[in-house]
Amino acid sequence: MEESILRMHDKTTLKNMAFNRGLSRRGHNGRNASRMRKQDFIDFIMVQNHRDQSAVLGSDFLGDDMIRIFQEFIMDETFTFNPFIHLMGTIKNSTSKSPVSNQPSPEEDEPIPDLTLKPLEPCTKCECTTCMKNSIKQEENLKVHQNILNLESKIMCVVCQANVRNVVFVPCNHLATCISCSANPLMPKKCPMCRKGCKTTIKIFF
């Protein structure tokens, strides 16, 4: 269901729809269910709709369009977790041949997927059409490889640099660390990205 259609419903209707889709009393967007606004209910329903659609796709190909969309959202360090959840859910399902059986336990960290590109075989320099095409492909692969490295640096935990970020710090709403790092008793009660005080954290499961 499109967001524009959801906006036509009143808050009570959206609340009932959200509870039917699995909303708990703990709420969404850092608010308890009793304190959620109309937009919070819409955000929750949209996330659930996207997860349902992604589960049906089951594709194992991460296309250029997905990388481009992903980059547009994460180029800004001040992004919040709502669009990030939306994209990470898609990527998780699109890179898994069995989305249901391969999902990690909610309390386990998710490692960064291996997105290494296989380079083209080198050839001697010449002016033939085949070699020129291979040269162009090599340049394109290098650009894509660099983009992937940039993406990995954006989605990795800013503390351990090994696992996927899946813990949101409230109230700044930065998606910054993995579950293990956020649970470390030695870690200060501050967001590691903006250094602002943290009132609570929210675990995001994809």
Curated annotation (Swiss-Prot):
Pfam short name (any one): zf-C3HC4_3
Signal peptide residues on this chain, from the entry's feature table: none
Keyword RNA-binding: no
InterPro entries from the UniProt entry: MDM2_MDM4_MUL1, Znf_RING, Znf_RING/FYVE/PHD
Stretches for region Disordered: 95-114
Superkingdom as given in the UniProt entry: Viruses
Polar residues biased stretches: 95-105
Keywords: Apoptosis, Early protein, Host-virus interaction, Inhibition of host caspases by virus, Metal-binding, Modulation of host cell apoptosis by virus, Zinc, Zinc-finger
One GO term (biological process): protein ubiquitination
PROSITE patterns: ZF_RING_2
Zinc finger (RING-type): 157-195
Sample GO molecular function, one term: zinc ion binding
Function: Plays a role early in infection by preventing host cell apoptosis.
Family label: Belongs to the IIV-6 193R family.
Name of protein: Putative apoptosis inhibitor 021L
